[in-house]
């Protein structure tokens, strides 16, 4: 990702000024009660497991089965963009164009639109970061231009209510229907959209499906995964909760498609439209409120290029130069050894099908080696992209993990220490453990840290500090440019031993070993913790003493976890 080059002292100065702003650490301690006054309980979560409560994804599928498409009195087709802000290989958009072409044969005046809906309350409830929202706003402007070249206007609708309402509410359904009616001048509209797998979003879609009528028909599609949720099950038809066997099936599934084509994944490319609708391209009037931008360093921030082309060229660069070294370099803290594609993937500026198709070209015809341990660098890169699918599948299978609950419900009994002062020090990079502080400061300053960094800091928070992993999970969402609830919950569950296919509880990262292995010359640490630049082996006065003793805190974690599990 292209970012401004900053000197270490700038980084620290900027972090200090940000500290003055960051005051409400309590918001990370629990779900926001304004939006979730009655959070799900362990019993409620178990209802999904014992099938006494239907999973939202199943409800969507059931409702969709009953649907029939009718073009009667329909004049408008509209694609509703969500986390799929791209033209290239977008299933819902592709279907939208196909439906429109069918409709056009019946109604020569039919129109095709695209829409994006802003609900700031959804952003607040989900703790979307300023970095990510700024990226989305830039991407929308760019998308508006690209769509205009296809003669498709992109509308921006804002849903605001005085009482802070999420989009899974009946108020939203009314708002949405009314907006559609206005666009189609009182006739019917067909909406296409790609499914988002978090429960709030699925319940929003369910509500809309339940309120379908002749004025509004909704068509939802699987798009964000390479293999859609529900397609990979064990031979007994149950859901996988362990990655490796799931991944082997995933590979089989993908290879099966490849047998009949030259590509490994099917891409959905829209043909040029024979359609020449003219309209005035008006700049969007919306600007992000300050509350979402307060954590962004004003003087130095630099967003990655938001265009679809930038995502493609980033992929090309990565596959051309770095991917062959991925196995050795992906974890190094001082190198950019990974693709840096996550913000593009999270916001949907690039499809993971396209990524895997392109990466596959350098895999000698095999997406995975016969023995997993022999996977080449590029094969392992594809495997990482598969982890993203895995976590999405899991969120559909265990929906309570999208409602603030751990996958392993027994871990609710862990007696967290939850020291708010220790939490603040972790958040702001002042724990006195250099590697943790360097990573947390980088996160604050840039909105991005690599996977190893996320694992190190998540392990430190949940094990060494014994702070409920959900505090850290929320902090990450609020500060990551690529914040994605299923991967974030999945990653935190893995590191804190509370989630799906997690590390065993007795695996506690040793911070000294992590530092020696992934930043042996302290290049990364000295960049972000400039206090340590000139300190040979002595701890300088202006750098905090370690918040915990690593050995003692490890033993404490083992005991507390063991007592609960
Ligand atoms: C505690 C924790 C929190 C995380 N939170 C997020 C998050 O909010 N959003 C997010 O996109 N990823 C998250 N991850 C996964 C991973 O760290 C990032 O996807 C990755 O660091 C992004 O950088 P990259 O694009 O350069 O990755 P690359 O190594 O180049 O990987 C390419 C893509 O594969 C996917 N991917 C890679 N590793 C993982 C993984 N372990 N799990 C799921 N998908 C993966 C991502 O889409 C990534 O962009 C988290 C991991 C942990 C341990």
From Swiss-Prot:
One of its GO terms (molecular function) is FAD binding. Pfam families: DNA_photolyase (PF00875), FAD_binding_7 (PF03441). InterPro entries: Crypto/Photolyase_FAD-like_sf, Crypto/Photolyase_N_sf, Cryptochr/Photolyase_FAD-bd, Cryptochrome/DNA_photolyase_1, DNA_photolyase_1_CS_C, DNA_photolyase_N, Rossmann-like_a/b/a_fold. Its main location: nucleus. Residues 384-391, 451-452 are annotated as: Interaction with DNA. The record marks 416, 469, 492 as: Electron transfer via tryptophanyl radical. Disulfide bonds: none annotated. Its EC number is 4.1.99.3. Its cofactor is FAD; (6R)-5,10-methylene-5,6,7,8-tetrahydrofolate. This is Deoxyribodipyrimidine photo-lyase, mitochondrial. It comes from Saccharomyces cerevisiae (strain ATCC 204508 / S288c) (Baker's yeast).
């Amino acid at each position: 990702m292209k970012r401004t080059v900053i000197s270490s002292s700038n980084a620290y100065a900027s972090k200090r000024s940000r500290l003055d702003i960051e005051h409400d650490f309590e918001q990370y301690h629990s779900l926001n009660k304004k939006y979730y006054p009655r959070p799900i309980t362990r019993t409620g979560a178990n209802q999904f497991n014992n099938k006494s409560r239907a999973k939202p994804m199943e409800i969507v599928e059931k409702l969709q089965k009953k649907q029939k498409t009718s073009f009667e009195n329909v004049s408008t087709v509209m694609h509703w963009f969500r986390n799929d802000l791209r033209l290239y290989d977008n299933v819902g958009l592709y279907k939208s164009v196909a439906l429109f072409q069918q409709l056009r044969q019946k109604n020569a005046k039919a129109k095709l639109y695209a829409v994006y809906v802003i609900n700031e309350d959804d952003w607040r409830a989900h703790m979307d970061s300023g970095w990510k929202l700024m990226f989305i706003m830039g991407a929308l402007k760019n998308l508006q231009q690209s769509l205009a070249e296809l003669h498709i206007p992109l509308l921006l609708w804002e849903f605001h209510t005085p009482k802070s309402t999420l989009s899974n509410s009946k108020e939203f359904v009314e708002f949405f229907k009314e907006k559609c009616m206005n666009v189609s001048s009182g006739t019917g509209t067909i909406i296409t959209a790609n499914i988002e797998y978090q429960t709030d979003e699925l319940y929003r879609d369910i509500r809309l499906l339940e309120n379908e009528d002749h004025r509004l028909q909704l068509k939802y599609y699987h798009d964000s995964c390479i293999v859609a949720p529900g397609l990979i099950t064990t031979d007994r038809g149950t859901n996988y909760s362990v990655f490796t066997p799931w991944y082997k099936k995933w590979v089989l599934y993908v290879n099966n498609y490849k047998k009949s084509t030259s590509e490994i994944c099917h891409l959905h490319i829209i043909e040029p439209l024979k359609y020449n609708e003219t309209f005035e391209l008006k700049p969007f009037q919306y600007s992000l409120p300050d509350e979402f931008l307060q954590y962004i360093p004003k003087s130095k921030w630099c967003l990655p290029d938001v265009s679809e082309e930038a995502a493609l060229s980033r992929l090309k660069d990565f596959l051309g130069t770095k991917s062959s070294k991925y196995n050795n370099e992906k974890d190094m803290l001082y190198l950019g050894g990974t693709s840096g594609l996550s913000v593009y993937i999270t916001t949907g500026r690039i499809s993971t099908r396209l990524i895997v198709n392109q990466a596959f070209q350098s895999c000698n015809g095999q997406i995975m080696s016969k023995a997993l341990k022999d996977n080449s660098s590029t094969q392992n890169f594809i495997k990482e992209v598969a982890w993203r699918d895995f976590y999405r599948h899991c969120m559909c299978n265990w929906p309570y993990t999208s409602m603030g609950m751990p996958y392993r419900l027994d871990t609710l009994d862990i007696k967290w220490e939850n020291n708010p002062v220790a939490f603040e020090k972790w958040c702001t990079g002042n724990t006195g453990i250099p590697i943790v502080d360097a990573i947390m400061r980088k996160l604050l300053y840039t909105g991005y840290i690599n996977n190893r960094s996320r694992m190190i800091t998540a392990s430190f928070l949940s094990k060494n500090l014994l702070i409920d992993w959900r505090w850290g999970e929320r902090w990450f969402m609020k500060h990551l440019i690529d914040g994605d609830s299923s991967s974030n919950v999945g990653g935190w569950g893995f590191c804190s031993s509370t989630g799906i296919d997690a590390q065993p509880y007795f695996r506690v990262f040793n911070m000294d070993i992590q530092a020696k292995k992934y930043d042996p010359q302290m290049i990364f640490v000295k960049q972000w913790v400039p206090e340590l630049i000139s300190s040979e082996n002595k701890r300088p006065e202006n750098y905090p003493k370690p918040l915990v003793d690593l050995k003692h805190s490890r033993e404490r974690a083992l005991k507390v976890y063991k007592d609960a599990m």
